[in-house]
Amino acid sequence: MSLLTEVETYVLSIVPSGPLKAEIAQRLEDVFAGKNTDLEALMEWLKTRPILSPLTKGILGFVFTLTVPSERGLQRRRFVQNALSGNGDPNNMDRAVKLYKKLKREITFHGAKEVALSYSTGALASCMGLIYNRMGTVTTEVAFGLVCATCEQIADSQHRSHRQMVTTTNPLIRHENRMVLASTTAKTMEQVAGSSEQAAEAMEVASKARQMVQAMRTIGTHPSSSAGLKDDLLENLQAYQKRMGVQMQRFK
């Protein structure tokens, strides 16, 4: 796996799924391929994206700044500086300085990532802030190692939180989660189906599923009533794709 592929993988792992994720992936690909060289426009676009957390925006801004060639005097962006300030916690800043000194001695991406992984997310963000604000310099490889270590920590905590929700025994949370997933799957079916004649059936199934979820939420139903709802939808979607000659992995 090439360095840039690895960076793209780690960065995208912390972006919530949805159309915006696809857009960000495309921007990253363009930047890494040298196709997008307007850093100013890129940062303005990033600043106004909805849904993304300030830290995710800060990390993406840091990656764009590292990768896109720019004039030396180009102004640093406030939204990135704020996100990479470690919440103003002096402990984070102290640790960030210690980490920075260690990173100065590293020359490889993997070496930097290993060193960085033993620090907290706040310290890692502050260290990125030091480099972003030109208060310290490291090689691009080392900076990318720092980025990937930060993303790995964030993705780990997101995964733990997701696993807790999936394995929760609270029937109300499980019920709501199944309905949310069914609704999202139905939306995806409508997008995948397109406008061909064969798509009508898939669209109808998706539409009925969304109506059912709406009705279940409106009248309030027994927590077990949503069981299998998403799986039924996925089976319908796969059957439709088979008829269309499209093979797509299950997105359970």
Curated annotation (Swiss-Prot):
Cellular compartment(s): Virion membrane; Host nucleus
Record's keyword annotation contains RNA-binding: yes
Cellular component, GO, one term: host cell nucleus
InterPro entries (alphabetical): Flu_matrix_M1, Flu_matrix_M1_C, Flu_matrix_M1_N, Flu_matrix_M1_N_sub1, Flu_matrix_M1_N_sub2, INFV_M1
Motif (Nuclear localization signal): 101-105
Renumbered residue ranges of the record's region RNP-binding: 165-252
Membrane topology of the entry: Peripheral membrane protein
SUPFAM superfamilies xref list: Influenza virus matrix protein M1 (SSF48145)
Stretch list, region Membrane-binding: 1-164
Claim: Membrane is one of the keywords in the record: yes
Keyword annotations of the record: Host nucleus, Membrane, RNA-binding, Viral matrix protein, Virion
Biological processes per GO annotation: viral budding from plasma membrane
Domain of life: Viruses
Miscellaneous remark of the record: Most abundant protein in virion. When expressed alone can form virus-like particles in transfected cells.
Family: Belongs to the influenza viruses Matrix protein M1 family.
Protein name: Matrix protein 1
